[in-house]
Every structure is written in C-alpha cells, then in structure tokens.
Amino acid sequence: MGWYLQAAFVALTVGVGNGLDTIIGNYVLRPRPSPTLVHVDVPLLYNSFPSGHACHMMVFYGSLLYLSFTRPVRTWKYHWVLLPFQVFAVLNILLMGYSRVFQGEHWLGDVLAGYLSGALWLTLFIFLYQWATKFVERRRSKRVGMQSMA
C-alpha cells in the first residue's frame, strides 16, 4: 500500500485533534496558573484546559509511534532507526507535559487531560485507519481479481 494512506492518517489525526482541543478549551474556560500562585514567566491570556501541547504531542507522536509498529515499517530496510525514534517520541511526549507544568503554563490536571483527550482521539483514528487500510486492500484485491479474469 502506498504512503498516501499513512500520510493522510497523520495529517487528519493531528488536524482534527487540534480542532477538538480548541473546542474543549472554549467550553471549559479554566484559567491558567496566575503569577500570584506560581512563578510564571509570561502570563498567557487564553484558557488552560486541556493542555494543547500535551494533546498535540500525544496525537502527533502517537500516530507516528503507531505507524512505526506496523508491518510495512518494521520490514523497512532502515528498521534500525525505529528504536531510537520510538524512545525519542515517548520522551518528547512526557517531557512536553513536564515542561508545561514546570514553566507554570498549566496545572498538572490540564496536562493529564491533554494526554487523555489526545489518546482517545488517537485511538479513534487508529480504528479508522485500520478500517480504511482493510477497505483499500479489499478493493485492490477485487480489482486485481477482475483484471486477471479478463
């Protein structure tokens, strides 16, 4: 199967995940940590719940991690690159959440909610990706079968 389905999977997952995060934040309206409570470098004016950074990292790197465990990628000639990438992706996801709390940009609950919403969105898109992959393979096998009969 061509790379277009994998590229569409990552692009749609990240793009729609960004929109979902914004919609949730506009409904919850939770304020960010204030300079009177914690040290904040630069107070931000927009809402804090859920952490968009944590959600985006979970969705983006999560989709790439998922693809890195699929058969076409595991049989890739440069498969030795996968383990360092997977470690990098997991560390990047975790350290982004830590940095958001450490800098006073988010409460811990905001970051955990960002991870959760990103994971739920990613899970839904993984199911859609698996369905689309099977659908494309069935159509391709029918088309090949019809061509061999002709």
For the regions a language model picked out, list residue spans one by one.
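Short, hydrophobic secondary-structure boundary micro-motifs
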Residues: 7, 34-37
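Membrane-embedded catalytic cores of phosphoryl/pyrophosphoryl-handling enzymes
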Residues: 37-150
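Interfacial segments of alpha-helical transmembrane regions
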Residues: 1-19
